[in-house]
Amino acid sequence: MEYIRLNNGIEMPALGYGVFKVDPKECERCVSDALCTGYRLIDTAQFYANEEAVGNAIRKSGIDRKDIFLVTKIWLTNSGDRKSQESFEESLRKLQTDYVDLLLVHQPFGDYYGTYRTMEKALAEGKTRAIGVSNFYADRFHDLACHVDVVPAIDQLETNVFSQQTRMRKLLSETGTKVMAWGPMAQGKDNFFGHETLVAIGRKYGKTASQVGLRFLVQQGIPAIPKTTNIERMKENFDIFDFTLDNQDMEALLSLNMHDSGTRDYTDLSYASRIIAQTF
C-alpha cells in the first residue's frame, strides 16, 4: 500500500473501498471482503444508509481500529450546527467507533458553514482526525476556505482519466488540499474498460484497463475509492502497487482528459434542485 500525506500531517491509504449504492443488506459482506483483500480505507456516508453495515464489518474483522482509515460524510438534510452534530453522533454510533479518520461535508448545499463548524469542533475533540468537503467546485471551495479556521484536507470529486480535475487541483494546491477520486473508473462510461489507450498500456504491464486507470490516479497522489461488490474485482483493483507507469504512458493518459471538471454540473439549477431534494 502507498500512502498520501494530508495538509494536517496525517497519512491516508492511496486506495480505498467505496460503498456508494451498496445495498445495506450486502454491504457488511462487501466490506468484509474488502478488508480481507487488504483494503484499509473504507468510504461511506450518511446518505448511503449503510454506515451500520460498515461498522459491523469492521468490528467483526478483528483488525485494530487504528489500522483502518474510516471516512463518512454529513448529508445536506443534516446541515447546520445542531443537526449536523446530532447526525454525526448517530453516525459514530452506527459505525461503532468513537472517531472517524476523515469527515466530509457531502454536498455544497444547505447550511454547510454550520456543518463545517461542527466538523471543526469534532476535530478539536478528537472525534475525527481530518475534515474536508465533497463535490465543492472552485467558487464555493474558495469562499469556504477563506472563512473557516481549518482549511479542508480533502475535496472528494469525480476524478478519472476522462475527468482529471486539473483546474480544481491547481486551486486546491494553494491550501494543500488533496483531491480524492470518486468514480475513478468513470462508472464505466466513455468505454472506460475497453478504451484502446487504457487496454494497450495495460497490455504492456500485464494489467487491466481498470488497474491502469487507478494507477494513473494514485501515481499522482490522488487517493481513489473504487466500488464493486465482486471480490475478484476488489482483488483486481487492489493489485496496482507492483508497477509504475512511465512518462510516455502518463502523457498518453493525460491526453484523455475530455471533460475536466466531471460529468455533473453543480451550477445547473435543475441538477442542484435534484440533489437538494434527495433524502435518505
Predicted segments, located by residue:
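N-terminal binding-site loop/beta-alpha segment at the start of enzyme catalytic domains
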Residues: 1-68, 185-186, 280
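Beta/alpha (TIM)-barrel catalytic core signal, keyed to glycine-rich beta->alpha loops juxtaposed to Asp/Glu
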Residues: 3, 107-280
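Acidic (Asp/Glu)-rich catalytic clusters
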Residues: 7, 55-65, 89-96, 121-123, ...
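Acidic-and-aromatic substrate-binding clefts and catalytic sites of carbohydrate-active enzymes
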Residues: 22-25, 45-53, 77-82, 108-113, ...
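Short, acidic/polar
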Residues: 23-34, 80-94, 141
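A structural motif
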Residues: 39, 97-100, 128, 152
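Glycine/small-residue-rich loop that forms an oxyanion/phosphate-binding "nest" at active or ligand-binding sites
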Residues: 77-116
